[in-house]
A protein has these predicted regions:
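Juxtamembrane intracellular "pre-TM" segments in multi-pass secondary transporters
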Residues: 1-10, 210-249
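Helix-loop boundary and gating motifs at the non-cytosolic
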Residues: 2-60, 246-253, 257-278, 282
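Loop-to-transmembrane helix entry/capping segments in MFS-fold secondary transporters
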Residues: 46-50, 79, 140-150, 279-280
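Glycine-rich segments within core transmembrane alpha-helices of 12-TM secondary carriers
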Residues: 59-63, 144-170
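Helix-to-loop junctions at the C-terminal end of transmembrane segments
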Residues: 61-79, 296-308
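Transmembrane alpha-helix termini and helix-breaking/packing motifs in multi-pass membrane transporters
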Residues: 68-74, 100-104, 160-184, 305
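C-terminal ends and interior cores of transmembrane alpha-helices
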Residues: 85-107
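C-terminal membrane-cytosol helix-exit motif in multi-pass small-molecule transporters
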Residues: 194-217
Length: 308
């Protein structure tokens, strides 16, 4: 049976972008929640865990470097955006497979941090390609709801890779799945995350068909154009931030919610372990907050489409 090309219809596009963004949240939840909690239980200090969690998000700050490259370097045979999404998802899976046998201990922390940093580099690049695809295939009337669903998917992906894995590690008492009653080791939890990513790869990405992009430049010209766009972006951004005091205050205001969220990333998990929360308790907290966040994302998207 042939799987549908989801981006060919409005409903399909909304479903596709929801699940594509979910593949960004799943590994983030696994690394920032599951791995951070297990590191704390293994006796790794808060400072080291904080550095590890901070490294997860570092590649996301440099997505603007990949934007021109994703725009200009592509294969019409694979699909201009589909090729990037497919390639980055495969590399995300490979980095998790490499990381799987490594024990979460202070001796291995530098190696694990490096591997997860590389993993998130591919995850952030995938985000650039997904956004580029959205710009190409979404109509103006679809963008508000689609954007809300995208961030809802990412938000729900976090507890799927974090809270759900913590439930599996602690153990789930299901009469029809007695093997999960005593819990699973952390190394086995990697397979759950990998399976979630590959499920989206198989059902959403592989059947996807893009309209071929017209090539206007040679490979060398495209790379030169990418370099020019990056330099132009840096120059324009710098002038925008330092040229007016309003822009500087705007930048500070934009950092406030991100800073508060960043403070909670590692601190919340390590403190929860210290005060006696079980893996299930931490998972419950993450599920509740993520569901509320996801609902607000969708509502915001609907309001955006209605009000403009």
């Amino acid at each position: 049976m042939l799987l549908p090309n989801l981006i060919a219809s409005r409903q399909g596009r909304l479903i596709a972008f929801f699940f594509l963004y979910m593949t960004e949240g799943i590994p983030l939840g696994f690394t920032s929640t599951t791995m951070a909690v297990q590191m704390k239980r293994a006796g790794i200090g808060e400072k080291a865990i904080g550095i590890f969690v901070a490294s997860l998000y570092l590649p996301w700050a440099w997505k603007w470097l990949m934007g021109p490259i994703v725009d200009l370097v592509y294969s019409n045979r694979l699909g201009a955006r589909r090729g990037w999404i497919l390639g980055t998802q495969i590399m995300m899976v490979l980095t998790l497979l490499i990381c799987m046998p490594i024990e979460l201990s202070s001796d291995n922390l530098q190696l694990i941090t490096l591997l997860i940093l590389i993993h998130n580099l591919f995850c952030a690049t995938q985000d650039v390609a997904i956004d580029a695809l959205a710009c190409n295939v979404l109509s103006e009337k679809e963008r508000g709801l689609a954007n809300g669903l995208m961030f809802a998917g990412q938000t729900l992906g976090v507890p799927l890779g974090g809270a759900c894995v913590l439930y599996l590690i602690e153990g789930i008492d299901l009469w029809w799945l007695p093997a999960l009653r005593d819990g699973i080791p952390v190394q086995s939890a990697y397979w759950f995350v990998i399976a979630c990513i590959l499920l989206v790869t198989t059902l959403v990405v592989l059947p996807m068909k893009e309209i071929p992009h017209e090539r206007r430049n040679t490979s060398r010209d495209r790379l030169q154009t990418a370099k020019t766009e990056i330099v132009s972006y840096i120059t324009t951004t710098w002038k925008s931030f330092v040229g007016k005091s309003v822009a500087r205050y705007g930048l500070l205001f934009a950092l406030l919610p991100a800073g508060a969220n960043g403070l909670s990333l590692a601190l919340q998990k390590t403190v929860a372990v210290e005060i006696g929360f079980s893996d299930g308790d931490i998972a419950d907290l993450e599920v509740a907050s993520s569901i509320l966040w996801a609902v607000m994302c969708v509502l915001g998207g609907i309001i955006s489409d209605r009000l403009g």
